[in-house]
Amino acid sequence: MSEIKDVIVQGLWKNNSALVQLLGLCPLLAVTSTATNALGLGLATTLVLTLTNLTISTLRHWTPAEIRIPIYVMIIASVVSAVQMLINAYAFGLYQSLGIFIPLIVTNCIVVGRAEAFAAKKGPALSALDGFSIGMGATCAMFVLGSLREIIGNGTLFDGADALLGSWAKVLRVEIFHTDSPFLLAMLPPGAFIGLGLMLAGKYLIDERMKKRRAEAAAERALPNGETGNV
């Protein structure tokens, strides 16, 4: 159970692919102009990570070490092609919006990195969980960045959600404030870099605060009974 918890915590927070490893920044910065686009690409990446980790872990004993990387890339490309066709069939609007960034998941360092670092060494169930956790960590980062950019830039949230979830999702659109002239800085690539920088700073501050609280709690437990540590 502790290993499962560690895999989940590492993927979602401690070893977050976007905020700690800084991998896959090209799609992260390019696609996150809206929350819908960010969520769509994040979920697609999560599905690819989960399936490729599961497949590579299952086949790890039959994969020659000398040619393992080309085999990993072939497996990843096959899964990405299947996911691309699914999005094309069931979410064509999202497919058009994401464009080239769906097939580019094949070259995403996150996918190949987890295959080599984790799936090739661990069992199928734990590898699938690792892929899912890493993918959801990246999805959360994309979603937060996309939401911030959409709110600041257009004053809306979940605009175009019907492209991802179907016509019923039009009711999810929220207009936080009305604007006739969008704030282009937030919608263009410079806004993505600024937003990512703020998210990195925020995560650092949260980690430092948590580290300080753990240190204070450990110091209090180490004191003899009745002592408070105050002079």
Swiss-Prot record:
Record keyword Manganese present: no
Highest taxon above the source species: Bacteria
Keywords tagged on the record: Cell inner membrane, Cell membrane, Electron transport, Membrane, Translocase, Transmembrane, Transmembrane helix, Transport
Transmembrane feature ranges: 18-38, 39-59, 63-83, 86-106, 125-145, 182-202
Main location: membrane
InterPro entries listed in its UniProt record: NqrDE/RnfAE, RnfE
EC number: 7.-.-.-
A Pfam family this chain is assigned to: Rnf-Nqr
Subcellular localization, as worded in the UniProt entry: Cell inner membrane
Membrane topology: Multi-pass membrane protein
Periplasmic side of membrane: 84-85, 146-181
Alphabetical list of PANTHER family matching this protein: ELECTRON TRANSPORT COMPLEX PROTEIN RNFE (PTHR30586), ION-TRANSLOCATING OXIDOREDUCTASE COMPLEX SUBUNIT E (PTHR30586:SF0)
Family: Belongs to the NqrDE/RnfAE family.
The protein's name in its UniProt record: Ion-translocating oxidoreductase complex subunit E
Organism: Escherichia coli (strain K12)
Gene assigned in the entry: rsxE
